[in-house]
């Protein structure tokens, strides 16, 4: 039989631990309760049948509905906390004494995750992701193996995709990924028929514009917007630099 709140709190703490076997109980009035118990089905040590633990529940001095809970095993404290009487799922009114078998032991927990709403499939004309490497198109090029390095010029005759990599005209000096050095160094101003390309310019002075100096800014090739400040647009002299006339790259 449970005579008061401190015994009830001790019983509820034991229920929250799991299957326990009470060895002894000792209650001092309505202020403290001491319980020695073993946890059932716990791994045993050599020379002992199971772990013997001790639960101590003490009512705090400043609040009658707050209790200090301490669980220790030997000289080691495994848990120490303060719990409130209202933290447990209990009826609004309790009639003393209580039967131990009729204690509410189910926790009052609400599900944290809710079921996500299933998204409906979009229409056929809804745009998909930006397929800059033509990944979707390459799936329909037959049974030949695909290049495992999309965007690079690494290729083999057995690969279905062409040898040219993505954006070769922009990523490589003078607009080509494999320039022909047999005729000497290429023209630093670029081939007039070339589409241009980015190239490191050690002589370029950093522009004072903030858009040219984002976090982590490094000197070198920068893209100058075709219709922005300093750009000549299509066909003009612009600020093409090494990339060629009007290329937009400086």
UniProtKB/Swiss-Prot annotation:
Stretches of Gly residues bias are at 229-250
Q: Where is this region: Disordered?
A: 179-250
Q: Care to name a GO molecular-function term for this sequence?
A: proteasome binding
InterPro entries xrefs: PI31_Prot_C (IPR013886)
Give the record's keywords alphabetically: Chromatin regulator
Composition bias of kind Basic and acidic residues appears in 202-213
> What's an example Gene Ontology biological process for this entry?
chromatin organization
Q: Does the keyword Amino-acid biosynthesis apply?
A: no
Function of the molecule = Plays a role in the establishment of transcriptional silencing boundaries, preventing the propagation of heterochromatic silencing.
Which family does the UniProt entry place this protein in? Answer: Belongs to the proteasome inhibitor PI31 family.
Q: How does it assemble?
A: Interacts with the 20S proteasome.
More about this protein: Present with 358 molecules/cell in log phase SD medium.
This chain's protein is named Silencing boundary-establishment protein FUB1
**From what organism does this protein derive?**
Saccharomyces cerevisiae (strain ATCC 204508 / S288c) (Baker's yeast)
């Amino acid at each position: 039989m449970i005579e008061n709140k401190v015994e009830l709190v001790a019983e509820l703490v034991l229920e929250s631990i799991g299957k326990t076997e009470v060895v002894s109980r000792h209650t001092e009035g309505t202020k403290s309760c001491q319980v020695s118990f073993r946890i059932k089905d716990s791994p045993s040590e050599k020379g002992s049948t199971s772990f013997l633990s001790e639960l101590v529940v003490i009512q705090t001095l400043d609040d009658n509905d707050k209790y200090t809970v301490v669980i220790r095993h030997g000289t080691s404290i495994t848990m120490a906390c303060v719990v409130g009487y209202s933290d447990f799922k209990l009826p609004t009114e309790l009639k003393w004494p209580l039967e131990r078998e009729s204690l509410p032991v189910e926790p009052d927990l609400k599900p944290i995750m809710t079921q996500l709403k299933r998204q409906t499939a979009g229409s056929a004309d809804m745009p998909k992701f930006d397929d800059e490497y033509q990944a979707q198109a390459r799936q329909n090029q037959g049974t030949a193996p695909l290049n495992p390095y999309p965007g690079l010029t690494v290729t083999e005759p057995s690969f279905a995709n062409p040898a040219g990599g993505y954006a070769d005209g922009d990523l490589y000096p003078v607009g080509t990924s494999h320039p022909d050095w047999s005729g000497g160094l290429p023209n630093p101003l670029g081939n007039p028929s070339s589409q241009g390309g980015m190239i490191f310019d050690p002589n370029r002075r950093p522009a004072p514009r903030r858009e040219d100096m984002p976090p982590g800014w490094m000197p070198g090739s920068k893209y100058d917007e075709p219709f922005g400040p300093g750009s000549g647009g299509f066909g003009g002299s612009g600020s093409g630099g090494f990339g060629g006339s009007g290329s937009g790259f400086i």
